[in-house]
Amino acid sequence: MAAENSKQFWKRSAKLPGSIQPVYGAQHPPLDPRLTKNFIKERSKVNTVPLKNKKASSFHEFARNTSDAWDIGDDEEEDFSSPSFQTLNSKVALATAAQVLENHSKLRVKPERSQSTTSDVPANYKVIKSSSDAQLSRNSSDTCLRNPLHKQQSLPLRPIIPLVARISDQNASGAPPMTVREKTRLEKFRQLLSSQNTDLDELRKCSWPGVPREVRPITWRLLSGYLPANTERRKLTLQRKREEYFGFIEQYYDSRNEEHHQDTYRQIHIDIPRTNPLIPLFQQPLVQEIFERILFIWAIRHPASGYVQGINDLVTPFFVVFLSEYVEEDVENFDVTNLSQDMLRSIEADSFWCMSKLLDGIQDNYTFAQPGIQKKVKALEELVSRIDEQVHNHFRRYEVEYLQFAFRWMNNLLMRELPLRCTIRLWDTYQSEPEGFSHFHLYVCAAFLIKWRKEILDEEDFQGLLMLLQNLPTIHWGNEEIGLLLAEAYRLKYMFADAPNHYRR
């Protein structure tokens, strides 16, 4: 039945994006054994398709053999309890997945790349603590050369995660000494923030290329509109807003067990453990309880949208930044039970209010049918068709729809595609830009897509393109890569934002 629904869905013009439950990316590699099992069953059939018919059939084969997000129930527990899933052996599934990827690469007949454009990639990885420039340990027995896509396709038992680098580019114990330029920037921030009335325009200008870690919490509070510019009013404002938030907790949180709120709370309760599942900080019960309260109270106070999957990701950058105000060591491995109750309450309330300010600007992304996202995806398609027609035509040739990969980019603000440290750096700029999370994000997505044009054009079938676009190799990215991405996005905005006819046919 699920297969029939899949075929019917893809053949009609879908207006509703539906569920977004299966999400993969830089932080969530595609390790679903059910998917790989379906692929290997049909591999022999794909090889027998004549070349002239391969283009037309590839999409329908993918649709027939893939369970859509729309066909999967919200309750993961029901899915995992099914007899078919219980009979799967994880080792066999992973081995099968590796074989599928190897066969897929052999299908593509291409000129051999020069050694200068290839990179050594380890076959087996282990989790290590490192800075943002840390290199992964390499198994000496594997000396084969692989292209950048294969970095993510090797499917190790545990994904590659340089732990410290995933959250921040600095930490108290291992950060390199600050340069003279960095010290000068930090001093300028401190002068701005300590003035009686902070010049917010100047603060935005200074924050665009990134905010120093030491002053990021207060800078984010100011840029989001949570704190007033006047220093004398800040303490009272924080006290009042924090008390107001916990007033909401007392008033509404007990209603989570009422019938008309049970579905909302149940979905939040399911989604919280999925939030950055490989970072120890977010697996602590106390942290998950904080996230549940934040998301439930926001959903109750915004009935037009309620809770939508993906909003849970938007809490994490604020939580990490405000936690770093009290923790100088490795944040992601820090045990929050070591903090006082007052500190935890401050972090929770500030995360709630700043997330609320963010969502106020993009709430049409999460109302019924998510019209904001559909509009942005269409705008991205039009923009890419003008700035890189070759990539756009490549998608059309292999029947790849922008909604199939860019929906997640808009819904999660690229958080599933980038390590968390990169998201925090990206949000420094988003909060410095007018309508950064809504308008400027479109140009960041366009620049992000074109960044991978070579890898995109190298893929010559629908499956390969979707695997690439849903699992882009950004795990080693840091401030430098984000800076280049933002510079390109700014160039695109300068060229097209005030001249819409430039990207209209």
Swiss-Prot record:
GO MF annotation list: 14-3-3 protein binding; GTPase activator activity
Which PROSITE patterns does the UniProt entry name for this protein?
A: TBC_RABGAP (PS50086)
Q: Which gene encodes it?
A: TBC1D22B
Q: Which SUPFAM superfamilies match?
A: Ypt/Rab-GAP domain of gyp1p (SSF47923)
Rab-GAP TBC domain span: 210-434
> From what organism does this protein derive?
Homo sapiens
Function recorded in the entry: May act as a GTPase-activating protein for Rab family protein(s).
**What's the protein called, per UniProt?**
TBC1 domain family member 22B
Quote the annotated effect of residue 143 to E: No effect on ACBD3-binding
* This protein's GO CC annotations: Golgi apparatus
Q: Which residues carry this modification: Phosphoserine?
A: 58, 116, 154
